[in-house]
Curated annotation (Swiss-Prot):
Catalytic activity: a (3R)-hydroxyacyl-[ACP] = a (2E)-enoyl-[ACP] + H2O
PANTHER family: 3-HYDROXYACYL-[ACYL-CARRIER-PROTEIN] DEHYDRATASE
MF annotations from Gene Ontology: (3R)-hydroxyacyl-[acyl-carrier-protein] dehydratase activity
Source organism of this protein record: Nitrosomonas eutropha (strain DSM 101675 / C91 / Nm57)
Broad enzyme group: lyase
Protein name as catalogued: 3-hydroxyacyl-[acyl-carrier-protein] dehydratase FabZ
Annotated keywords: Cytoplasm, Lipid A biosynthesis, Lipid biosynthesis, Lipid metabolism, Lyase
Function: Involved in unsaturated fatty acids biosynthesis. Catalyzes the dehydration of short chain beta-hydroxyacyl-ACPs and long chain saturated and unsaturated beta-hydroxyacyl-ACPs.
UniProt family annotation: Belongs to the thioester dehydratase family. FabZ subfamily.
Matches recorded under InterPro entries: FabA_FabZ, FabZ, HotDog_dom_sf
Active-site residues (renumbered): H47
Length: 144
């Protein structure tokens, strides 16, 4: 799934679209996606000058966006159908290594549970095959 298709499903836009490509998607199970981290990211001007490090909260947001794509596609949710998909909880976040300009984040998200409109996921981000972030995420769809 390229960026044009991603934009059909996610409501996010610049500067907060944090998934560049989906490389594999198993409906109802898992997704693998990429976020290419460029020196042109707006947050690098302040985090940190002369040592650009991607804020951990944005790595988690990238994982949540990948989770949203997985669920929106798995559940055949329509964009602009009077509902929005919210990130509602997070547990066990660990940041193992910094992510810097030039890195490619590999986002891996797996559905672990779905109950009463709440989806739970096991998520991790890797750079060059090394774990940089891991977390348990929770999301839900709500009427707007």
């Amino acid at each position: 799934m390229d960026i044009h298709e991603i934009l059909k499903y996610l409501p996010h836009r610049y500067p907060l679209i944090l998934v560049d490509r989906v490389v594999s998607l198993e409906l109802g199970k898992r997704i693998h996606a990429y976020k290419n981290v460029s020196i042109n990211e707006p947050y690098f001007s302040g985090h940190f000058p002369h040592h650009p490090v991607m804020p951990g909260v944005l790595i988690v947001e990238a994982l949540a966006q990948a989770a949203a794509l997985l669920t929106i596609r798995s559940e055949n949710m329509e964009k602009d159908a009077g509902q929005v998909y919210y990130f509602v909880g997070i547990d066990g976040v660990r940041f193992k290594k910094p992510v810097i300009a030039g890195d490619q984040l590999v986002l891996k998200v797996e559905i672990t549970r779905q109950l009463k409109g709440i989806w739970k996921y096991s998520a991790c981000a890797e750079v060059d095959g090394q774990l940089v972030t891991e977390a348990q995420l929770m999301c839900t769809a709500r009427a707007i």
